[in-house]
Every structure is written in C-alpha cells, then in structure tokens.
Amino acid sequence: VWTIIWTVVNVFFHYVFGLLLAVVLNQRLKGRTGFRLMLLVPWAIPIYISAIGWSFIFNGEYGLLNNILAALPGDFSRVAWYSEFPWYYVMPIIVNVWAGIPFMMVALLGGLQGIPQDQYEAAKVDGASRWQSFWAITMPGLRTVSTTVILLGCIWTFNLFAVIWFTTRGGPAGKTNILVTYAFDVFNQGELALAATYGVIIFSILIVFSLVYRRMSPESQ
C-alpha cells in the first residue's frame, strides 16, 4: 500500500509543481534563463547524492532543519524525522519531490512552447479569461506530453531505490519500505526466495507500466 501511496503522491506533486513552474517560465520574465538554470540544479545532482545530503539536513540531532527550528522564537521542539509519525513518510516524499520537479518542468515547458500563440490571442478576443484559456487551450494542448511524463514518472518513482534507502532505509520497522527496498532488505537477510519473488512482482508491474506507456505514446497513435 505504501508503495502505491509513495508513487501517486510523488508523481502528483511532481506534475503540479512542474506545471506551475513551466507556466511561469513560459512568460517573458526578466532573468528567466538564470531562474531556469537554478531550477535544474536538483535534476543535475545524482539522486543518491541528493538523498544523502537531505538525510543530513533532516538528522534529528545535528540536522540543519532542526537547528533552524530550535533557533526560532517560540516553543519549537526538535522533530524526530526518522521515527515520528507522519514525518518518516513525509520526509522522503519531500526529498523526491525536490529532485523530480525539474524533469516535469522541462518536459511541460517544451509542451507549452509548442502550443500556437494565436489560439490564446483568439481566446482573448472572444473575452476568455486567463483561467478559462488555461483549461480550454493549455491543458488540452499538454495532453500528450502530460500522459507521457506522468507514466514515466510512475515508472521511475515506483522503482526508485536511492531516496528511500539513503534517507529512512525503510524504517522505522520497515514502514517506509517500498517494494524495491524491501526486496533488497530481504536479500541482505539471506531470504533469497522471497527476494526473487519480489523481484518478479516488481518486474511484472514495470512491464505493465511499460506497455501502457508504449500504447499511449505519440508514436503508437
């Protein structure tokens, strides 16, 4: 169940924040190029390095985040990110959302730039608001690229080992394990048959995702 929640929640926030940033960067803003490069930094950093770095930030004893909370005026206590509900679920999601937004942003920005501007001009002449134009022109224009990036996001997130392993290591008591980290965990414990079973399950699910992606990709239509 947690694997499904992990995948859905991450891809949802990847898409929403990626779309929001893509819409902003699609405007003619001063310093847009520099802002775009800055937002690509999380994507440029290898995911395991990002996960290790964030694990220090969230460390309960000497982590940067808890030190900031302790320095704030008021009664802010240190948070046990790795053992306190719901933070041991929230923390790896924050890390993965931070790392995954740039991909969605770049892909959706490319889709936005492919929508003819005359459609927006015609809608403006007809009296449509920006919000109405967004739902009538932008979202339909992004349908193909949205389908592609959401499916790819599901495939990558479902099978993403590094973030869980280098932050919570599946803890506490295996509660944050997803299928791929659980398979690795039982393999290390010498339960080879169970690890192989989970490997087959993961492979089968990824095959289904891949078939759906292939069927819904533009080349197959």
Task: Label each PLM-derived region with a short phrase.
Residues 1-221:
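A structural signal for multi-pass alpha-helical bundles of membrane permease subunits
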